[in-house]
Design a protein with these regions (language model features):
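Low-complexity, flexible helical/coil segments
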Residues: 50-60, 74-81, 159-165, 203-210, ...
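Amphipathic, soluble alpha/beta structural segments
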Residues: 61, 65-75, 89-96, 182-184, ...
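Phosphate-binding site of ATP-dependent enzymes
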Residues: 16-17, 101-123, 130-135, 140-224
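Short, flexible beta-strand-to-coil junctions
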Residues: 21-23, 128-131
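Short, surface-exposed, polar/charged, turn-prone segments marking secondary-structure boundaries
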Residues: 23-26, 44-48, 66-71, 151-155, ...
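A glycine-rich phosphate-binding loop feature that marks nucleotide/adenosyl-phosphate handling sites
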Residues: 79-81, 122, 127-129, 272-275
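Conserved N-proximal alpha/beta basic substrate-recognition cap immediately N-terminal to
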Residues: 1-120
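C-terminal active-site "lid" helix and adjoining low-complexity regulatory extension at the edge
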Residues: 196, 205-276
Length: 276
């Protein structure tokens, strides 16, 4: 039931409306102008408006400040990225700029690998700056690979969920997936409410490699053992001897990402109040 300023049911008037849709195709009009109710998350957090590059710029700043506090290189918790706009994969428009940006990022990653003695071959992941759902994703190890994209790849990159056309992409430093669950490559996904880590799961895919996108058909999921982690520091032993508690580390990065998201949404809020 929609009134002038509220949305509810026949016998229920909520103070808060919880949204569980990413709104890639846009927000329905029935949710607009609800100034007396909270929308969680707000409308400008939908993926028709939100951009990955904006989030990662905010996360980069948070990681730098956190790294300075601890005296660590922020790169250890913040993979490098860049953004390219003005693309049209169907017509090969902007591919030269994408190739140049990809080559530049791979060069930066190689320098970091040399600094830390990492012998793996670097790669980047190119994905739409808008949208979600693991669509329109491409792994590149050499910028020359972008010279001759086949029609299938162009079509995959040109349009994503809900028919959205891709004109802007984010190029992210690829990070090899080291985790395994039942011999399948696995990556952690952490759930948060407010500033609290409340759980998570491993997304795993037996048919994908350590440098591939796991968010694809055939993926399966198992809960993360946050509460009953067996990898806790042992009492009385020297620091660094106990096996690392990976689950705690996941939670730290998740909380940093949540802080970055709060900065992001505050900066992009169309109804933000301005104080003189």
């Amino acid at each position: 039931v929609r009134t002038k300023v509220r949305l509810g049911l026949k016998n229920f008037d909520a103070c808060t409306i919880l949204l569980n849709n990413d709104r890639s195709a846009g927000s329905p009009g029935i949710l607009e102008d609800l100034h007396e109710q909270y929308l969680l998350p707000p409308l400008h957090a939908g993926w028709s408006v939100r951009r990955k590059s904006t989030h990662f710029k905010n996360y980069e700043e948070v990681a730098k400040r956190f790294g300075k506090m601890l005296g660590i290189d922020p790169w250890l918790i913040n993979p490098m990225f860049s953004q390219v706009g003005g693309l049209n994969f169907a017509e090969d428009t902007g591919v030269d700029a994408l190739q140049a940006a990809t080559d530049a990022l791979l060069t930066k990653v190689r320098r970091k690998y040399k600094e830390y003695g990492i012998n793996e071959k670097p790669f980047v992941v190119i994905k739409p700056d808008n949208g979600t759902y693991g669509m329109g994703i491409m792994t590149v190890r050499d910028a020359k690979e972008l010279d001759a994209l086949n029609r299938k790849t162009k079509n995959k990159m040109a349009v994503i969920k809900d028919g959205q056309t891709v004109s802007d992409v984010i190029i992210q430093e690829g990070v090899l997936t080291q985790e395994r669950v039942n011999d399948a490559v696995a990556e952690p996904v952490v759930y948060m409410m407010d500033r609290y880590v409340v759980g998570g799961f491993y997304r795993m895919h037996a048919e994908r490699g350590v440098d591939e996108n796991l968010n694809s058909p055939g993926a399966s999921f198992v809960p993360l053992a946050f509460e009953h982690s067996t990898h806790m520091p042992q009492p009385g032993v020297r620091p660094g001897v106990s096996a690392p508690n990976r689950f705690y580390m996941y939670g730290v990065v998740a909380r940093l990402a949540m802080l970055a998201a709060s900065y992001e949404l505050e900066a992009t809020d169309p109804d933000a109040e301005v104080y003189d």
